[in-house]
Amino acid sequence: MGLLDPSQKEVLRFAVNCRILTLVLQALFNLIIPDHHADAFCPPRLAPSGSADQLVEGLLGGLSRWDAEHFLFIAEHGYLYEHNFAFFPGFPLALLMGTELLRPLQGLLSQRSCLLVSVALLNLLFSVLAAVALHDLGCLVLHCPRQALCAALLFCISPANVFLAAGYSEALFAFLTFSAMGQLERGRGWASGLLFALAAGVRSNGLVSLGFLLHSQCRGFCSSLAVLSPWKPLVKLMASVCLSVLIVSLPFALFQYRAYIQFCSPGSAPSIPEPLLQLAADKGYRLAGENAPPWCSWDLPLIYNYIQDVYWNVGLLRYYELKQVPNFLLATPVTVLVVWATWTYVTTHPWLCLTLGLQRTKDRENPEKPHRGFLSPKVFVYLVHAAALLVFGGLCMHVQVLTRFLASSTPIMYWFPAHLLQDQEPLLRCVDTEPGKLPQEKSPPGQKAPRNCLMKLFYDWKRCSPVTRCVLVYFLTYWLLGLILHCNFLPWT
């Protein structure tokens, strides 16, 4: 940690502590609370279970609930069933690489137990690296070290906490996405494009991140028009746009092609163990080698669209039913947060928003005073990204996933609450510090001042403003409630 500045050390320390606490609590809740008998994917265990496997299951079994079972199944058996293709291959491949590092334990543990250990260790690593990457990105975009630090600390107690620890792809996706954004802010387009492509191989919404590359290229094009004739920059823009689209969409295209070859080409059925064949027969899961599914005859045969439609009933306004009101209530806080952030930014920078962030001021001779923090002009493209994800998720997806969907995809989820804390909380309202230095707070005699601004707020809870209490209660409630419910197959997905 000698190469890290004090703020980075604080983020790293707090992130590791939160991850370890999460693993301990999920084991505790999994032990003392009986599992709910949910109608979820539950494949049979093919390997015999020894005492070491039972110990691993007892300690880490809470990480294998709901969709985590799909990722573990894919990592162990591959893409056998049609609906497995709803889950992208990036995270299962990472789990397989993790189990290779655990090869010395494979004589003691079954493949599934090794995968569970891999889930715990890799997601601890990915979520910690994501916190560090978010802090780095915040310093580059916000130009406000205190706000960047506060946002990274908030990520450590994210409302999507359980999904950053369990066998889900959110932690890996957040790390790749925040890292790609940071590389783009540094002007490293190639590195950013490759990281965005990797993220698109982890989750489908990684394709939306293509917009960051396109916006950056359009900004460069507009800047070059002031000194060059338009033709050369235009040709360069078209070439870079085409290349960006190709690079970022390639993992998705290859994944869809793999599914087409498996399900739509004759003689492509893999060998499947009998218990898994029986599961397919009992549950009606489609296997390769049977009659070709309907999507094979589409003009654009995309299995992903078909699965979301048929298996998960994902579509415009399909989730708007009276029985889903509790799930809409669960998604209300994150919706309010992003809408509030959008309104605050648009009312502060109307001209910047009208010009899509390509021209900062209407009057170049009398430019407005530059803002720092969340209201920085650089935040515009990130806000558009967050708003687009919210609109799509709210209209077309199962709304209860909005929290983890946004919390792992957009830094706005943490930048805006950090802005609220710094703007509305008198305890944090002081002169900004230089990059790399932690704020020095006054403390009572004989008591060491906390370097972590969140810990300071927890210590002085009674003096906190109502806005601060609302933000922290939201983050901590979802942080803890998600662990209690999700780890016992209760409805928190």
Swiss-Prot record:
Where does it live in the cell?
A: Endoplasmic reticulum membrane
Modification after translation (UniProt):
Not N-glycosylated.
Which taxonomic lineage does the organism of this UniProt entry have?
Eukaryota, Metazoa, Chordata, Craniata, Vertebrata
Q: Which topology term describes how it sits in the membrane?
A: Multi-pass membrane protein
Q: Which InterPro entries match?
A: PIG-V/Gpi18
The protein depicted here goes by the name GPI alpha-1,6-mannosyltransferase 2
Q: What's the gene?
A: Pigv
This protein's pathway: Glycolipid biosynthesis; glycosylphosphatidylinositol-anchor biosynthesis
Report disulfide bridges, numbered on this chain.
none
> What GO annotations for molecular function exist for this entry?
alpha-1,6-mannosyltransferase activity; glycolipid mannosyltransferase activity
Instruction: Give EC number(s), comma-separated.
Output: 2.4.1.-
Which regions of this chain are Lumenal-facing, per the record's topological domains?
35-77, 135-136, 183-192, 256-327, 400-469
Against PANTHER family, the record matches this protein to: GPI MANNOSYLTRANSFERASE 2
Annotated source species: Mus musculus (Mouse)
Cytoplasmic compartment segments: 1-13, 99-113, 158-161, 214-234, 349-378, 491-493
Organism superkingdom: Eukaryota
